[in-house]
């Protein structure tokens, strides 16, 4: 079953967040299980961003979490945020083309 993790964060340093994501991608090439990431900005709350990460399954997401680079990434990402991040862990029930 596909799995999506949504990470909501507040930051005044979005360019650094995006650079950190690209660095993590390079470090985990060929080993990460994340299939797609989408970084979005809230139009109504300009310092609020949402990262949407898609995985083949919950189990694949967990193996991705155990990569040493992911732990380092999370620690560094926390340092770029204004407050704690909020996580949503979602099992995909259906996907419909619109």
What do these predicted ranges mean?
Residues 91-98:
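Short, low-order "capping/linker" segments at domain edges
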Residues 23-36, 44, 54-88:
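An amphipathic, aromatic/His-enriched active-site/gating alpha helix that lines ligand/cofactor pockets
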Residues 9-20:
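Short, surface-exposed ligand-recognition loops at beta-strand->loop->(often short) alpha-helix junctions
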Residues 40-44, 95:
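Short beta-strand micro-motifs enriched in acidic
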Residues 6, 16, 71:
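N-terminal/domain-start segments enriched in small and hydrophobic, helix-friendly residues
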Residues 2-10:
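Short glycine-/aliphatic-rich beta-strand segments at the starts of folded cytosolic domains
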């Amino acid at each position: 079953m596909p799995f999506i993790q949504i990470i909501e964060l507040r930051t005044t340093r979005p360019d650094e967040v995006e650079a950190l994501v690209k660095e993590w991608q390079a470090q985990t090439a060929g080993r990460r299980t994340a299939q797609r990431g989408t970084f979005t900005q809230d139009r109504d709350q300009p310092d609020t961003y949402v990262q949407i990460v898609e995985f083949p399954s919950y189990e694949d997401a967990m193996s991705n979490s155990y990569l040493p680079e992911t732990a380092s990434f999370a620690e560094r990402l926390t340092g770029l945020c204004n407050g704690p991040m909020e996580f949503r862990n979602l099992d995909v029930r259906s996907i419909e083309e619109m």
